[in-house]
């Protein structure tokens, strides 16, 4: 229950019985201690970015994590916003293996939407609720160095598909992120990388989040989606997946489309030492807090073994 979604009875924080308040705090306390001083990377996307109630709730949740001593780092997507902007200029987005085909005009739109409109909206909301957020792209402090992605052609082994200005991460320089964390700021990162000659590249936000979690030695990577987690072919939630099970789901086509880079990045992060990797339903209010601060099993956990 929360103040944003009142039922027939009063459900404001003030109306919650003292015993229940104490129970909520008691459940959260071990997790606050466990993650105090730790970096939590959050991939923020989907409905949580487009529905007003969820947007405001996310901003407050991130601030709370910071206030209790954690170091949240937000990596955001913006697919629906990019699609809408492309529609206005008469273009339709196309995808290959979950990656957006990005010609020169599309790249200009991506830069404007992600590095401008979407990022500024997130930063503004966090600051509006009393947090201190700073927006970054890959150019800031040399954060994300990228090169053109070579997309393997699955039907022609050894061949590659040209999908334009889509980036492959060459290196991440975490200095600017760590400096912001040390000064109590919340970094909000747009998934745009840059080559040494200044060419901008559109990078899948899941890929950036996974690599950022690895480089920052994050305790936890949480990916917010528009589904409950990873689903089997019958629509059942898979709550726990090992590397072997993920490979089987890739092979039989259960994981496809936009889930391919998401699950690949989650698995890579787990293999690289990120202690906890979860894919959760961002359509649920305060799902981020439920995942981090409660015992409730939520979404899909990705394991490296």
From Swiss-Prot:
Disulfide bonds, paired cysteine numbers: none
GO cellular component: a single term: cytoplasm
Catalyzed reaction equations: N-acetyl-L-glutamate + ATP = N-acetyl-L-glutamyl 5-phosphate + ADP
Transferase as UniProt keyword: yes
TM spans (from-to): none
SUPFAM superfamilies per record: Carbamate kinase-like
InterPro entries to which the protein is assigned, alphabetical: AceGlu_kinase-like_sf, AcgluKinase_fam, ArgB, Asp/Glu/Uridylate_kinase, NAGK-C
Intracellular or extracellular location(s): Cytoplasm
Gene Ontology terms describing biological process: arginine biosynthetic process via ornithine; L-arginine biosynthetic process
Pathways per UniProt: Amino-acid biosynthesis; L-arginine biosynthesis; N(2)-acetyl-L-ornithine from L-glutamate: step 2/4
GO molecular function, one term: acetylglutamate kinase activity
PANTHER family per the UniProt record, alphabetical: N-ACETYLGLUTAMATE SYNTHASE, N-ACETYLGLUTAMATE SYNTHASE, MITOCHONDRIAL
Family of the protein in this entry: Belongs to the acetylglutamate kinase family. ArgB subfamily.
Name this protein carries in UniProt: Acetylglutamate kinase
Organism: Cupriavidus necator (strain ATCC 17699 / DSM 428 / KCTC 22496 / NCIMB 10442 / H16 / Stanier 337) (Ralstonia eutropha)
């Amino acid at each position: 229950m929360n103040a944003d979604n009142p039922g027939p009875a009063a459900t404001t924080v003030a109306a919650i019985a003292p015993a229940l308040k104490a129970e909520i705090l008691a459940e959260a306390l071990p997790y606050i201690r466990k993650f105090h001083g730790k970096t939590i990377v959050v991939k923020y996307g989907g409905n949580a970015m487009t529905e007003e109630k969820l947007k405001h709730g996310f901003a407050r949740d991130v601030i709370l994590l910071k206030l209790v001593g954690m170091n949240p780092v937000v990596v955001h997507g913006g697919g629906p916003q990019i699609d809408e902007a492309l529609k206005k200029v008469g273009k339709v987005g196309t995808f290959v293996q979950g990656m957006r085909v990005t010609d020169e005009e599309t790249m200009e739109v991506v830069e404007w939407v992600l590095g401008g409109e979407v990022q500024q909206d997130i930063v503004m909301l966090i600051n509006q609720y009393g947090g201190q957020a700073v927006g970054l792209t890959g150019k800031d402090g040399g954060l994300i160095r990228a090169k053109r992605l070579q997309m393997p052609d699955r039907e022609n082994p050894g061949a590659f598909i040209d999908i334009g200005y889509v980036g492959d991460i060459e290196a991440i320089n975490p200095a600017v992120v760590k400096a912001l964390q040390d000064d109590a700021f919340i970094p909000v990162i747009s998934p745009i990388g840059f080559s040494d000659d200044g060419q901008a590249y559109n990078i899948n936000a899941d890929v950036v989040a996974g690599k950022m979690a690895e480089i920052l030695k994050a305790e936890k990577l949480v990916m917010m989606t528009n589904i409950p987690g990873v689903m089997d072919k019958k629509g059942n939630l898979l709550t726990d997946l090992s590397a072997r099970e993920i490979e089987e789901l890739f092979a039989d086509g259960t994981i496809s489309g936009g889930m391919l880079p998401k699950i690949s990045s989650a698995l890579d992060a787990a293999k690289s030492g990120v202690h906890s990797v979860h894919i959760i339903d961002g359509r649920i209010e305060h799902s981020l807090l439920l995942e981090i601060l409660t015992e409730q099993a939520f979404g899909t956990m990705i394991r490296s073994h």
